[in-house]
Amino acid sequence: SLGSVAVPIGDTAAVIWNAMWGLELPQGISRTIILGVRLPRVLATALCGGALALCGAAMQGLLRNPLADGSTLGVSAGASLGAVTALLLGISFPGLPFAGTMVMAMLFAMGSLILILSLSYSADRGMSTQTIILMGVVFSMFATSIISLLTAFSGEKLRSITFWTMGSLSGAGYTETLVLLGALAVFGGVLLSCADELNAFSLGEDAARHMGVAVGPVKLGVLVCVASLIGVCVSVGGSIGFVGLIVPHAARLFTGASHRRLLPLTLFMG
């Protein structure tokens, strides 16, 4: 495997295979590098990519917009604002140094969603897709400007904030991987179960309502799941773009427009 320390592919495969089946692990530095550093990074990267891609596919189906992803709703920018705030204020929990960033990112993601939906409802009682997108874009620009302002006054925290905003999973461990896995199992499972409803949304909200879909609750449920997943991913890996936008379109080349096949393949490709 590639990295600052070269480990032969055979050694990498042997370490992972023996660890999976409880066999005696090879001695040497390669065991520590593979199991302690690189394996959790790879797992976290796979889970984060799959979650972001799944969120993008769900958003594109819900909003009927091929350019939609997590950033369209403004949730990604809100989660980034929460994480930057945690880094700037040094918020942490004993024994879990990353938990402060994660909690703040999730809280700001949910708060952003509530604010965007509230503004959308006040402007349009029907909460049309166009209104939600418009409010999301406006809030995303506002949150990005606040992040720039906080970065300018961050002082000694400038390096850590700048490095985090670039997006990196180099610090991911097994704890972060388990959190990602749990979030993906819960919220991703809900999104996968909404495949038929998203197929109905692709025909328009009125058509979906006539087909028996509870438009309001389904829309709210999908948005909450997307916001939660993005909050977790942003807190672990920083602001990562284009995955939720590009991967769903690549998956459609193989599955077509049916979300019953699109969502699982998007999750796998991500």
Model-derived features with residue positions:
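Alpha-helical transmembrane segments in inner-membrane proteins
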Residues: 1-270
